[in-house]
Each structure stands twice: as structure tokens, then as C-alpha cells.
């Protein structure tokens, strides 16, 4: 994370400083379908070409975020949470795991992603060495005019029918394609066959899992000239082969308070996601925000910029693309600026 994101005064330090929010530096992934937008538009400054994903909030073994401000700067988020498990929260399902149960990403799809499916927790626990499955939620940050997603199947089908269609290159006739636009949201339950299409810029909130079973990858080759591995047997074992209803975008229902509006985007057993819009340019009162003891929270800034004023007067500046982690039972901050966030809770 570059220094532009951090402006912490050092008036004094005390025990309460350990409960202040901190910035996270992401891990980058250079999958072949990625582009340049995360560096160009979100100032990620990651030396990868292409840059397909940034894991903004992650403690996964395949890539942990790095703390980029405050007392723990330079440590991995995984290290910090192992030192301070109380930062995760008091809810029983969080304490039972003792680790971060979710991951938050930005995804830049310059090309189509593979047609894929993720296992649920039970299957992953039994067949993938106790790992989590993967249910996820997508929020569309931007989309090309013709951008689309694959969202399940058009009709009920059978394993062998899909297997044959993969072998003869006709899988796409079974797939439900959905046009997308900026601001759309989609809930992708484990077992749903899906794919992000070219031209989509996505924020993804998901279980902390990197398990993906590919059904079809357009016969592409990687930088070494090799086709990427398919996982057809496992994919067909976990896939929901019933037709999926075409998703309908919900009516927007905002809750307002001075300088702030918020709406619930997604509620499931794994996470809650709100969209929060802050604009204090025309009001004297800053927007208060903090986590409670039950769970950590994460604010992902998807547009705009501003600052967070701590109780001791220290200031944390944030910009578009920044990810801020709030330990459970955090100090209260006052937010000033004009910005949009995804507000993630467990």
C-alpha cells in the first residue's frame, strides 16, 4: 500500500489503540483472463500483468492480506488474528473456527472466466482435507455494454448429458446467460454452475476458500502453452443440475441518517453485506461507525475518498479501492468525505 493511504498522527498510544481499524494491502493473482483495471483505476500498484484478482481481506493459505497501517503494519492479517483471536468476535461460529471465515476480492475480467462450480462445506470437509466450501456474492462495480454472467442452467439436466456436451463442445447451450450492469448484485450458492463474463469488474464476498472445479475453459492455454486443468468429475458430483430462476434485482430500500445512507444487499449464514453511502460535504456532523463485540467488520471503499477520525484524534485516510478492517468491539470512528462502501459483517 502506498503512503498516500496512510496519515496517522501519533499523539499518544494506549491499550485502545489495539482496537482501531487498519488498512489492508491485498495479494494479487495473475490469472490469464485478467486485465489492468485494478492497477489503473484502483491504484493497487501490484507488479503483475495481467492482474486478475486482488484478495483485499484474506487469511487464506494461498494468500494473506498484509496490514498496511497502525501498530501491526507489515504483519499478515493471519498473524495478527492468531495473536488476537478476540478481534474476530464473540459469535459461537466465529470462535469455533478461530480464523477469518470470509474473503473479499476485486475481480477484473478482461476475458471470460472458466465455467465452474464450487463445493459446499460438507463436500469440501470430506473430500478436500477439511477445507471450507464456497458460497459467494457478487457486486458489479462496472460492466461493458454487452457484459454478462453465467448463472446456473436453463433447464433441468443430467450428469451424463452435461458430460457429453463438455466433450463435444456444446456446453454453452445449457447455460443461463444474464446481462449485467453497474450496481447489480448476485448470490452464488455452492453448487451453482457459473462464470463471470468478459468486461465485468466485480467485488466478491465469499467463504474463505480457493476451491474451484472447472467444467469448461474455452480450450485456452496459459503462458507456458498448457491448457488449464478441468475437474469434470468433481464438478458434476457437486453441481446443482436443476434449472435456475433468472435473478431479479431487488428494490432498493435505504436507511438514512445524517450524512449516510445504507441498504442491505445480501444476508446469508456466512456473511451480511450492506452498501453504505457517506457524504458529509454538506453537513457539519461526521458519520459514526464501529463494530460490536459479536463480529469484526470490513469496509471496502468502492468509490470516493475521505478520512476516519479516531477517538484519540488520529486520522486514517482512505481512497477508492482501500479495504479497512475493524476488529470486533472496535473504537468508534467518525467518517468524513464522500464515498461508497461495501460494509461486510459475519
PLM regions: where:
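His/acidic/aromatic-lined binding-pocket segments of jelly-roll/cupin-type domains
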Residues: 104, 113, 130, 136-139, ...
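Short acidic-glycine-tyrosine-enriched beta hairpin
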Residues: 175-187, 310-330
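Loop-centered beta-sheet repeat module
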Residues: 165-214
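Short beta-strand segments in beta-sandwich/barrel cores
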Residues: 283, 304-309, 323
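Ligand-binding loop in jelly-roll beta-barrel domains
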Residues: 99, 107-112, 143-146, 192-212, ...
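C-terminal amphipathic alpha-helical segment
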Residues: 213-289, 293-296
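Short, basic/aromatic beta-hairpin or loop at an interaction surface
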Residues: 156-168, 294-305
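Transition-metal
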Residues: 1-157, 217-248, 273
Amino acid at each position: 500500500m502506498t503512503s498516500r493511504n496512510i496519515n496517522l498522527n501519533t499523539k499518544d498510544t494506549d491499550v485502545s489503540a489495539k482496537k482501531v481499524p487498519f488498512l489492508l494491502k491485498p495479494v494479487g493473482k495473475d490469472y490469464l483472463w485478467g486485465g489492468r483495471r485494478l492497477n489503473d483505476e484502483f491504484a493497487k500498484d501490484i507488479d503483475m500483468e495481467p492482474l486478475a484478482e486482488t484478495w483485499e481481506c484474506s487469511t487464506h493459505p494461498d494468500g494473506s492480506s498484509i496490514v498496511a497501517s497502525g501498530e501491526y503494519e507489515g504483519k499478515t492479517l493471519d498473524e495478527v488474528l492468531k495473536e488476537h483471536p478476540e478481534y474476530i468476535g464473540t459469535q459461537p461460529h466465529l470462535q469455533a473456527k478461530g480464523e477469518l471465515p470470509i474473503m473479499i476480492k476485486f475481480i477484473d475480467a478482461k476475458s471470460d472466466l472458466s465455467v465452474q462450480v464450487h463445493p459446499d462445506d460438507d463436500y469440501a470437509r470430506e473430500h478436500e482435507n477439511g477445507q471450507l466450501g464456497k458460497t459467494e456474492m457478487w457486486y458489479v462495480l462496472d460492466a461493458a455494454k454487452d457484459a454478462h454472467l453465467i448463472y446456473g442452467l436453463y433447464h433441468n439436466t443430467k450428469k451424463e448429458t452435461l458430460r457429453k456436451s463438455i466433450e463435444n463442445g456444446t456446453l454453452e447451450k445449457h447455460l443461463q446467460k444474464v446481462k449485467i450492469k453497474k450496481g447489480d448484485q448476485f448470490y452464488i450458492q455452492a453448487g451453482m454452475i457459473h462464470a463471470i463474463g468478459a468486461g465485468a469488474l466485480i467485488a466478491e464476498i465469499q467463504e474463505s476458500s480457493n476451491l474451484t472445479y472447472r467444467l469448461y475453459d474455452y480450450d485456452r492455454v496459459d503462458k507456458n502453452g498448457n491448457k488449464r486443468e478441468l475437474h469434470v468429475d468433481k464438478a458434476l458430483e457437486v453441481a446443482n443440475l436443476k434449472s435456475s430462476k433468472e435473478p431479479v434485482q431487488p428494490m432498493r430500500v435505504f436507511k438514512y441518517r445524517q450524512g449516510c445512507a445504507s441498504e442491505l444487499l445480501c444476508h446469508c449464514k456466512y456473511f451480511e453485506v450492506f452498501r453504505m453511502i457517506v457524504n458529509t460535504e454538506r453537513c457539519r456532523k461526521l458519520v459514526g461507525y464501529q463494530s460490536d463485540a459479536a463480529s469484526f467488520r470490513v469496509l471496502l471503499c468502492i468509490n470516493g475518498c475521505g478520512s476516519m477520525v479516531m477517538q484519540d484524534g488520529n486520522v486514517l485516510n482512505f481512497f477508492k479501492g482501500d479495504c479497512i478492517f475493524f476488529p470486533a468491539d472496535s473504537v468508534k470512528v467518525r467518517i468524513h468525505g464522500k464515498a461508497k462502501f461495501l460494509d461486510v459483517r459475519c
